[in-house]
Amino acid sequence: MTNNKILNMKKVSLGTVLISSLVNQVSAQEVPDIGYESDTIEHIAVSGRPMSDIEKPSTAATKMDVSIKDTGRSMMELDADDLKMRALQDVREAFNYVAGFRANGPADRTYIARGFSTSIDNVMVDGLRSLQGGEGGTGSKLPSTFNAENTTFLRGPEAILYGAGVAGGLINITSKKPQTTAKTSIGLNNRSYASSDTGNFKRNDTSFNLDSTGPITDESVLYRVLAQYTPSGDHFQDGREIEELLLDAALSFELGENTTILPRFERTDRKRTGGSGYADGVFESTFASGEVTTYGKPINRGKYYGSPIDVGENESTSASVLIKHQIAEDWKLAANFRHNETTSNALDLYISDSSALENEVGKDLVNRKWVYSAGDDSYNLFDINFEGKVETGSIKHHLLAGYNYRDMDIKFARSFQDSADAVGKNPISASNPDQQVTGPIPDGLVDSPAKPRTQTDTNIYLKDRISIGNTTIAAGLAYVKQDQEELSSGETIASSFDDTLWDLGVVQKINRDINVFATYSRAYEPVKGRYIIEYGNGKTDYKPVEGNNYELGIKGDLLNNNLTAAVTLFALDRSNSTKFNRGDDGWELLQLDGKSFESKGVEVDAAMYFSPKFNSSLSYAYTDAHDTVGDDKGVQSNNTPKHAVSLWNNYTFDKNISFALGLRYESERNDGDYKIKSYFEADVGAYYKTDDWDVALVVNNVLDKNRVEAGANWVTVQPNTPRAVNLSLNYHF
């Protein structure tokens, strides 16, 4: 970064920004104090010893005002500057710089955390779940970060505070809040692809941005409006475009000295040509040989293997209100409510793995079939908690008591063309996708009736952090309940699950700068009713997936605060894990009895301040994750590299100009029966900033590596993004 942020009384140096990019945890419920200016509003020269930010309060893992150093969990944060400097547009792209997390296949329904496949509804906005898309590929995607002040990645489960469904880890986006200082920014972002297989600067994704904040009357009423409009954004694959409008509008009312009310409205309107995700895959270089074991390089990376009439739409509206009230000096209340409505639909012609399509590895002519899906989802989410502190002699208690509720009403429809009917009607050439036939859409395909599903989640939780001298013991207790009801083929399946969960941790202060910690937390996730109906083959007595998470770590400041580091050893296990298996009658949902999965490893997040002009940040994860029973016993879990590392380097040339270099590596991964090769990629950036202007030029995948990002359908693969030249220009006034 070229300059410092001024926060509150201008006490924050470049070291604060550096450290926060690695180990700062963002609040899942927090509304900044009205006087807290989280945006850059002033620039000063960088000089002197970096100041540590490790004592800053953080609530993502605890929902309590606990410092980073005192939080006994492994987590990483990317703030707005980190996202901008790396040209990261959404959570999926942010995974590139967060070891231990990575995206799955093209439909974006799950992501990997600590080797465990995790539903995307574990992505939260301001502490509440935010699916922001329909079921089953109907336009759902990992959320944009256009309005993110911070994005936090919590490794491991946290069922005590967030309830059922938190698997390998959760993600929380803290949205930008209204500020007391009036400021408006308008900008333009453009991403162009420059590669031999996509053409040079022929495919461009341009968006226009607005960020305006300040007081409306006096400082007791503030506003913030953020918007991003992409009129016709090109994907790197020819034939795929997106038109997208993102809007986030918020107010802040300060009612006296003790109460703040923050209503917020968010809107997403997304239209895609070229499909919703089913047909993202391309073929790779070993396909023509007739045998695929380890994927080769993607071929025709810049081509789309779906049809010219594939479309996808997604509209999502969210209204929320956050209330914070200071009850007494040491007691406060926080209440957060959100209502979300989403409609979505998608039509795709895709290459299925169905054997009835009669496709063969090595055979150039490949059959495809139509799929249509639609969703109409409604969510109500609510969280309220009381936090306070009491002392009994030499023992200090930091207490939290809360209630979390989610009500889901989902109507989901999905219909596939019969595979036998599709044979010969929609062929495409594996070697040249321009040679294809788009057959008619089967009658009634888009008229498939929706299958309604309702689900309610209740979570009552209690936390107590008991401090005696330099030792803090953190204990938690929660009652978790989930009720599901689903209608399919005239049959209603209702199920109810509940459990009492507990967790325990200890944080030991070694000295002023260093703490060690040990933590135990729980995971609890009932099986979705939709999966039971569609893939259970008559089996209905599925047990909830349960798990344990153990962490042992150290975090603190070293070398006169020039090095901030967090090192965590972890062990995670699961009982009653589920997995999809291709049987003679199609896909079936299997459940492995007892302890069935484990993941062990180490995570390192560090930031080094070498000089006032040069600093680096590192994220590394070693993950050994596999089934402990069954045919895949001991086999590394899908899409999970044993080694993942990212390194980001900043060099400040002068007060206006800076440069950056990012390096990323992942070791070999599995994709079912196939292997995905290891890779190394590099990103570079150049930045210019004044009081009124900032310009950034970032080239992702600067060496234009052509590799497999993930598996898709059958033996097709999702290619990585080619060399992307990102230019952003912003004017501030």
Enumerate the predicted regions with their spans.
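Surface-exposed extracellular loop regions of Gram-negative outer-membrane beta-barrel proteins
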Residues: K271-S285, D407-K411, D483, V507-E551, ...
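Outer-membrane beta-barrel translocator/receptor signature
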Residues: Q132, T138, F146-E149, I160-L247, ...
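Acidic, small-polar-rich N-terminal luminal/periplasmic segments of exported/outer-membrane proteins
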Residues: S21, S38-T181, S195-N200, L552
